[in-house]
Amino acid sequence: MQGFISQVLGPVVDVEFKDYLPQINEAIVVNYELEGKECKLVLEVAAHLGDNKVRTIAMDMTDGLVRGLTAVATGNPISVPVGEKVLGRIFNVTGDLIDEGEEINFDKHWSIHRDPPPFEEQSTKSEIFETGIKVVDLLAPYAKGGKVGLFGGAGVGKTVIIMELIHNVAFKHSGYSVFAGVGERTREGNDLYNEMKESNVLDKVALCYGQMNEPPGARNRIALTGLTMAEYFRDEMGLDVLMFIDNIFRFSQSGSEMSALLGRIPSAVGYQPTLASEMGKFQERITSTKKGSITSVQAVYVPADDLTDPAPATVFAHLDATTVLNRSIAEKGIYPAVDPLDSTSRMLDPQIIGEEHYKVARGVQSVLQKYKDLQDIIAILGMDELSEEDKLIVERARKIEKFLSQPFFVAEVFTGSPGKYISLEDTIAGFKGILEGKYDDLPENAFYMVGNIDEAIAKAETLKEVSRKDVCLDNCKVDKAKKG
């Protein structure tokens, strides 16, 4: 059905039809010429103004749009390609390829506006999603089909953790991942693409980008584009999918911009009045079904570090676990720099993870907390002033801190150490042994950047051998000096 543009107000475009009224969320296409180039703009219907006139939100820049241009209603919402063909490629909000690679004919397309799975299809089991990362699996385990908040400043290793998770899901669970770049920097999107290429994980992930320089419609709907691709892998292929959203705050922020542009009365702190329902509608689609699951890791930017801001506060209500990255841990050279005391999970419950796992996790946190409390005394008076019991706690805590580090597959290029995937059983056994004092005789350096506890024992032997050789060399030098 053909109509024409009657008004252009930045990213908001009014379209008038003669005998037709498009539905809310229907896609309208405008083809026009700008500086001698053919352009195609997709608009999404956001409001009915009466007299067959609709107000739409543009999914790209509206440069060059003029009143009177022909607009064609498609009769359907925005639909994007789905299936295995999307892996290794970069898409924009409308499902067009933007990686300058070879063109592909996609045979399957799904609408980005979908209902969540019905209750009878959803899985009621509480299962752990094993990541192979010790600190996560032990202290803040992810729920299969759950939602994880990833908190951390710039340069503490968010991207590396995301890439490692993509790697482990692909190689250990034979699963796929979808990455949605929601309103982040174009440079970061480019860096992530290149790093994934170098780390050989690109062919297991689909990338959807709606970056900072794009209109609010594109930044908001890109999250739905990525989620739709993930839903296909879950519902049609029965896979366990990992969905990354960087950054979920930008989803709320762009929704707020759209709301203001449409003239809706703002709510608290200027956010849209529908903030909670929009977030709920989106998050409800991320779930486990009897066929497969979508587990999402969502980077959360907290504006001005204010946790009570409505945007992050609305996200917190949906999270099952939080992974907090701490700069002070990264400064010690411990990677991944996950804070073992700040990170949380609703899965850390003896009825879900079992008594042994729960006791070991709480034991580790207890020792680390005591060590944290003792640090002021150590800084002022030194280790010698501590009681024997406290000295033992400090020694074990330092070993635990070191043992929480691990070499990543995707960081092999930088560290020179082969990556390690550590099963949950090995992780629990290793930390249980440290808490029980089985490894009190091993040096703390033996626990740094190793996989399971057997590797720590082997590393301790190597360190002992090296120090023995050093002592022999020193003795030989002394003997030669005496003879000389």
Swiss-Prot record:
Protein name, UniProt field: ATP synthase subunit beta
Key words, A-Z: ATP synthesis, ATP-binding, Cell inner membrane, Cell membrane, CF(1), Hydrogen ion transport, Ion transport, Membrane, Nucleotide-binding, Translocase, Transport
Coiled coil: none
Function description: Produces ATP from ADP in the presence of a proton gradient across the membrane. The catalytic sites are hosted primarily by the beta subunits.
A Pfam cross-reference name: ATP-synt_ab
Residue numbers binding ATP: G152, G153, A154, G155, V156, G157, K158, T159
Reaction catalyzed: ATP + H2O + 4 H(+)(in) = ADP + phosphate + 5 H(+)(out)
Membrane topology qualifier: Peripheral membrane protein
InterPro entries assigned to the protein according to its UniProt record, in alphabetical order: AAA+_ATPase, ATP-synt_VA_C, ATP_synth_F1_bsu, ATPase_a/bsu_AS, ATPase_alpha/beta_chains, ATPase_F1/V1/A1_a/bsu_N, ATPase_F1/V1/A1_a/bsu_N_sf, ATPase_F1/V1/A1_a/bsu_nucl-bd
PROSITE patterns found in the cross-reference section: ATPASE_ALPHA_BETA
UniProt signal peptide: none
Oligomeric and partner information: F-type ATPases have 2 components, CF(1) - the catalytic core - and CF(0) - the membrane proton channel. CF(1) has five subunits: alpha(3), beta(3), gamma(1), delta(1), epsilon(1). CF(0) has three main subunits: a(1), b(2) and c(9-12). The alpha and beta chains form an alternating ring which encloses part of the gamma chain. CF(1) is attached to CF(0) by a central stalk formed by the gamma and epsilon chains, while a peripheral stalk is formed by the delta and b chains.
The encoding gene: atpD
EC number of this enzyme: 7.1.2.2
One Gene Ontology MF term: ATP binding
Chief localization: membrane
